Design a protein with these regions (language model features):
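Conserved, mostly hydrophobic/aromatic
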Residues: 12, 43, 53, 69, ...
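Long, intrinsically disordered low-complexity tandem-repeat segments
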Residues: 517, 538-575
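Active-site groove signature of glycoside hydrolases
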Residues: 104, 168-194, 277, 281
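Active-site clefts of carbohydrate-active enzymes
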Residues: 270-292
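Active-site-proximal helices and loops of the catalytic beta/alpha 8
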Residues: 86, 90-92, 116, 177, ...
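Carbohydrate-interacting/catalytic domains
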Residues: 1-52, 58, 88, 319-483, ...
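Substrate-binding/active-site clefts of carbohydrate-active enzymes
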Residues: 1-9, 13-49, 56-178, 200-206, ...
């Protein structure tokens, strides 16, 4: 049981939260990081025990164009500030992971500056991809190079160069030695070279017990990254999209299908892949903005904290703040905030109280961290599932309807369950419990009485946390609901029941399910699952308007010397020159391949290995990133 298995993360984008300038003048350090010290207490108060913070290191602008991996960004302070901050986190029981931006660097990075000065004679010319001294760019460098995202201010590192790999591995060792960091979130992990990531995993295993590697992966088969030899976890963008759209559309089938598919990727692990779950971050719109019905904040967050995976809350979202993604700027997603503005949030902000309650409940329950997942009930508007360990069962019930709903769900051999948010106690009858789930709310039912935690950290009653849904809770309900009964509770009218049944039957028909079944059938309900908003769904091989990176040319990232340059483990005798030559030829062919050809190659290999479902086929066509597809096809070997 590693620390990250029971982690509840808080996510801070420090340049935004501290109000740092958007451009770095490389002047004297301004000690803004110290202003985040009071946030450590807040992080603990809302039930978090881990912090993902970044980017942190010297950069040109938004933090992802690193110029010095071993120096805190001068807009935030100096290295002593960062040491003190991590130490304070540890003293308060908060683990810390940094943002590791290793796919690309900024133009002021020392090695790139050397290439600009010494050109062909630079010792670092092979540190970057496809450097062409016959080309040019908008900076009039007199040469061209591969960039990231179409921006020449982001210079793509050649991760297959042993010197680059060794340098980055040394950076990780430095971060642990200097700052005592507990893990790293790998930026753009879905296009990082697999051999490079395996080298990072080797360093992670070496530098510190339970050092955690989590990667940013937008889509695809997460098991390609999450395994014993590569990363511990990746960002769960599939669930992120399902959580908000499943509530906006009143379609719990989408969420349940996504959960079932992702949980199945975990193989024999009862707790699944332990993906990094979130409802918003520094790249996507705030959940409070995304939700059509703000009352859905409650059931969305109940699911975030109880489904398989590691939950995370993005700074400010616990207050219910809004943030809409703009066409040419993410500034509205990364605002400066002051805790003084929210000093009474735990008393009068329903979003904050619910978030805090869920964080503490999550940490109190082993079942929510380690339990298996079993779906118990599913309609368009209601959803129930259990998380089970040998010693504890948690049953989670959510309702996205504007009316209360009475659920009867199986509960195994347990006799009594305790509502952690409402304080209710219900007794089992013939292996089932009957519970009332209030409108636009959720509840977590646990079997262990000694873990009972009635949710309001401020000392009031908790039922309003999941019924009001808004941010102002002055008129919240007082007093507990009656225990073990539905007397006096609002239930649906006959007309409402008929409406919901008709809607449910239509969904089941669309999903290929027989009426009256609670589980997913063989149909393709999940075919309606879309990509996150950061991606346009691609139903064809043209990439839906994406600029393809290097889709018709060699990357120029050949590994110098006689080291291997394939993104996979070499099979057979490493000294077999003919074998290596064949592998290099295949690599070059893949890297020159176009999007459509790479997709068809992946599908052909998958079909050779077994049956390919419509969902698997759609996953391939949804991936329209050249580098990601190249890594995918190499991962089969």
């Amino acid at each position: 049981m590693a620390w990250y298995d029971e982690a509840v993360f808080y996510h801070i984008y420090p340049l935004g939260l501290t109000g740092a300038p958007t451009e770095n003048t490389y002047g004297e350090p301004v000690h803004r990081l110290n202003t985040l010290l009071p946030w450590i207490t807040h992080i603990r108060e809302i039930g978090c025990n881990a912090l993902y913070i970044g980017p942190l290191f010297e950069s040109v602008g938004h933090g992802y164009e690193t110029t010095d991996y071993k120096k805190l960004d001068s807009r935030l302070g100096d290295n002593e500030d960062l040491k003190a901050f991590v130490k304070a986190c540890h003293e308060n029981g908060v683990r810390v992971i940094f943002d590791g931006v290793f796919n690309h660097v900024g133009r002021d990075f020392f090695a790139f500056q050397d290439v600009k000065t010494n050109r062909e004679n630079s010792a670092y010319k092979d540190w970057f991809c496809n450097v062409n001294f016959w080309g040019n760019n908008e900076y009039n460098d007199g040469f061209s190079y591969d960039n990231w995202g179409g921006y020449n201010l982001l210079v793509k590192l050649n991760q297959r160069n042993p010197a680059v790999r060794d340098y980055i591995c040394d950076v990780i060792r430095f971060w642990v030695r200097e700052f005592d960091v507990d893990g790293i979130r790998l930026d753009a992990a879905d296009v990082l070279d697999f051999e490079f990531m395996r080298a990072l995993r080797g360093v992670a295993n070496e530098v510190k017990p339970e050092f955690w590697l989590m990667g940013e992966v937008i889509h695809g088969d997460y098991t390609r990254w999450v395994n014993e030899g590569t990363l511990h976890s990746v960002t769960n963008y599939h669930l992120h999209k399902a959580l908000y759209s499943g509530h906006n559309d009143h379609n719990y089938f989408e969420i349940a299908h996504t959960v079932t598919r992702l949980y199945g990727m975990g193989g024999n692990r009862p707790d699944g892949l332990k993906l990094y779950n979130f409802v918003d971050n520094h790249d996507v719109e705030r959940i409070y903005t995304k939700l059509n019905n703000k009352a859905h904040y409650a059931p969305v967050h109940v699911l975030l904290y109880t489904l398989p995976g590691v939950p995370s809350v993005y700074y400010g979202s616990e207050f219910g703040i809004e943030g809409k993604k703009e066409k040419f700027s993410d500034a509205s997603l990364r605002p400066a905030l002051s805790l003084d503005e929210y000093k009474d949030a735990l008393n009068n902000n329903a979003c904050t109280k619910l978030t805090a309650a869920l964080g503490h409940i999550r940490q109190a329950s082993k079942a929510l961290s380690y339990g298996d997942y079993q779906q118990l009930l599913l309609t368009n508007r209601q959803y129930a599932f259990s998380r089970n360990t040998q010693d504890e069962t948690a049953i989670v019930t959510v309702n996205n309807d504007d009316s209360d709903y009475v659920m009867t769900v199986p509960c195994g051999n347990h006799t009594v369950f305790y509502g952690m948010l409402t304080g209710q106690e219900v007794s089992a009858v013939n292996g089932t419990i009957c519970v009332n789930v209030k409108a636009n709310s959720g509840e977590i039912w646990l079997t262990n009485a000694d873990k009972l935690f009635v949710a309001d950290p401020a000392g009031g009653e908790a039922s309003a946390l999941v019924t009001d849904g808004g941010k102002d809770d002055a008129q919240g309900q007082q007093g507990k609901t009656e225990q073990g009964t539905t007397d006096g509770m609002k239930v649906k009218t006959e007309a409402e029941e008929e409406r919901d049944q008709a809607e449910t039957d239509r969904t089941r028909q669309n999903c290929g399910m027989e009426a009256g079944t609670g589980g997913m059938g063989a149909g393709s309900c999940g075919d309606r699952t879309e990509l996150p908003e950061t991606c346009t769904e691609a139903g064809n091989t043209k990439g839906a308007g994406y600029e393809q990176q290097g889709n018709a040319k060699d990357t120029g990232c050949e590994q110098p010397g006689n080291a291997k340059g394939a993104g996979y483990e070499q099979q057979g005798n490493a000294n077999d020159e003919a074998h290596e030559a064949m592998d290099r030829a295949l690599d070059e062919a893949f890297e020159r391949g176009k999007i459509a050809g790479l997709q068809e190659a992946i599908l052909a290999i998958m079909e050779r290995n077994g049956n390919v479902t419509d969902r698997m086929r759609q996953d391939v066509y949804d991936n329209v990133y050249h580098d990601s597809l190249v890594n995918w096809v190499k991962s089969f070997r």
